[in-house]
Amino acid sequence: MFESRPDRDAEVVLIGRSNVGKSTLMREITGHTFDTGQRPGVTRSPNHFDWASADFVISDLPGFGFMKGVPEDVREEIKTDVVQYVERNAEHILVGILVVDGKSVIDIIDRHSGPDEIPHDVEMFHFLREVGVEPVVAVNKMDKVDDKDARLNELCDRLGLHPPWQQWQETIAPISAKHGSTEPLNEAVRHHLHEVQRDDLFQFF
């Protein structure tokens, strides 16, 4: 269980599988470099970044899902910790940024879809909605995707959102964190902050 959360009223969280670029995105949003492990699963506790002048924190939660060299029971424990963290702090979390790898997300979802299996990304998207946290899917590494519209439409379909993706721009945000191309995500987050009358937090996005 994660115990390190700063005492801040408002929060935005980054959630996602290992190796989807969460740490790069966190650095892009905050301008701050975090100590991240070279191997997936090394980061087992959240990275929090808060500003002294604002009652606000951004949290990068540990990556879940398959991690090479990490036992399955440890992977499940990390995922459980992430879920419990969100449940425990849901009333403070204004937006849940679900980061996925635009290049591989469809293959991963399809590989793990079956009668007895729900893909982690799909499960986490609906979980955020169930606990009252607005999800924004940051579809990262889109600079590596050729047919962007087709890929984003497929992702909408897998998440139960009726394509075309352009009608879901408050929920689906194609980005490339490595290249600093995050404006669609910033706009989506600002939309949800405005909905809860927190325009004062626009300065961070």
Curated annotation (Swiss-Prot):
GO BP terms: namely: cell division
Keyword Membrane in annotation: no
Requisite cofactors: Mg(2+)
InterPro entries assigned: G_ENGB_dom, GTP-bd, GTP-bd_ribosome_bio_YsxC, P-loop_NTPase, Small_GTP-bd
Does the entry feature the keyword GTP-binding, yes or no?
Answer: yes
Matching entries from CDD domains are given as: YihA_EngB (cd01876)
Q: Name one GO molecular function term.
A: metal ion binding
Domain EngB-type G stretches: 8-195
Q: Where does Mg(2+) bind?
A: 23, 43
Q: Which UniProt keywords apply?
A: Cell cycle, Cell division, GTP-binding, Magnesium, Metal-binding, Nucleotide-binding, Septation
* List of residues binding GTP: 16-23, 41-45, 60-63, 140-143, 175-177
Q: Which NCBIfam families match?
A: PRK04213.1 (NF003255), small_GTP (TIGR00231)
State the similarity comment.
Belongs to the TRAFAC class TrmE-Era-EngA-EngB-Septin-like GTPase superfamily. EngB GTPase family.
Q: What's this chain's function? A: Necessary for normal cell division and for the maintenance of normal septation.
For this protein, the record's PANTHER family field holds: ENGB-TYPE G DOMAIN-CONTAINING PROTEIN, MSS1/TRME-RELATED GTP-BINDING PROTEIN
Name of the protein: Probable GTP-binding protein EngB
Q: Which organism is it from?
A: Haloarcula marismortui (strain ATCC 43049 / DSM 3752 / JCM 8966 / VKM B-1809) (Halobacterium marismortui)
